[in-house]
Amino acid sequence: MIHPEQVADMLRPTTSTTSSHVPGPVPTVVPTPTEYQTLGETGHRTLWVTFALMVLSSGIFALLSWNVPTSKRLFHVITTLITVVASLSYFAMATGHATTFNCDTAWDHHKHVPDTSHQVCRQVFWGRYVDWALTTPLLLLELCLLAGVDGAHTLMAIVADVIMVLCGLFAALGEGGNTAQKWGWYTIGCFSYLFVIWHVALHGSRTVTAKGRGVSRLFTGLAVFALLLWTAYPIIWGIAGGARRTNVDTEILIYTVLDLLAKPVFGFWLLLSHRAMPETNIDLPGYWSHGLATEGRIRIGEED
């Protein structure tokens, strides 16, 4: 027989001594917004200042040719065209017309949640490559004319130079995450640059000796100066545009210094030395100097 108090104890609710684990909330991850690497105020001002310096240099180069006969203005014309093209390029970049963005995927690593990714978009000034594709062949042409390099080697040097610049453009605008593509174009461009050195430096140093010691020394100085500067361009690209180790403003400042040295400074050096050395003159009569005004005239009284 069960005592009534035992029945009451049996009917009372009992509390469990074991506790169940309640899972906590899952950590949330806020997606990282797209990161834009663009030029700042320093880079913008640098582009405008360089544009003004290129325009000023173009005007001075044109004035230097004022008293030079048309038949002997070849170096003046080429040098002026180089800085004119550079002026247009820097105006386009300063106004934001010759620029685009190249995006790459960056991964963010987390401890307790899956990794996430976000886009890193870097500003690329493609107008710079248009400038180089037009002006560097003209610079090579000046060096080859000064040294007396034959047309075949001059053409090969110019073609290799254009390939080098285009490879740099393809690498800069290629798919950001495709490392093989980017550095593949970069490697091809570097090999093309070796061909430029081969045709200009080696063949130029051989042919310029026939023009005398003064011209030989001038060519050697200009060629070493130009090729050292051009060697710096792919190095800077690999650090800035390729590996993205510098900001856009720093990239602009470095390229600006190189462009000013490779174009206005090189041009002043060449033209002032050219004026002091008559043996560097290249006389171009005929169509270059007089056009077609004297062509096709009928001379009466002369035998055929």
Swiss-Prot record:
The modification N6-(retinylidene)lysine is found at K263. InterPro entries: Arc/bac/fun_rhodopsins, Rhodopsin_retinal_BS. Keywords: Chromophore, Membrane, Photoreceptor protein, Receptor, Retinal protein, Schiff base, Sensory transduction, Transmembrane, Transmembrane helix. Residues 273-304 are cytoplasmic. PROSITE patterns: BACTERIAL_OPSIN_1 (PS00950), BACTERIAL_OPSIN_RET (PS00327). It is a multi-pass membrane protein. SUPFAM superfamilies: Family A G protein-coupled receptor-like (SSF81321). Residues 1-45 are extracellular. GO terms for biological process: phototransduction; response to light stimulus. Binds all-trans retinal via a protonated Schiff base linkage. It is found in: Membrane. GO terms for molecular function: all-trans retinal binding; monoatomic ion channel activity; photoreceptor activity. GO terms for cellular component: membrane; plasma membrane. Belongs to the archaeal/bacterial/fungal opsin family. This is Opsin-1. It comes from Neurospora crassa (strain ATCC 24698 / 74-OR23-1A / CBS 708.71 / DSM 1257 / FGSC 987).
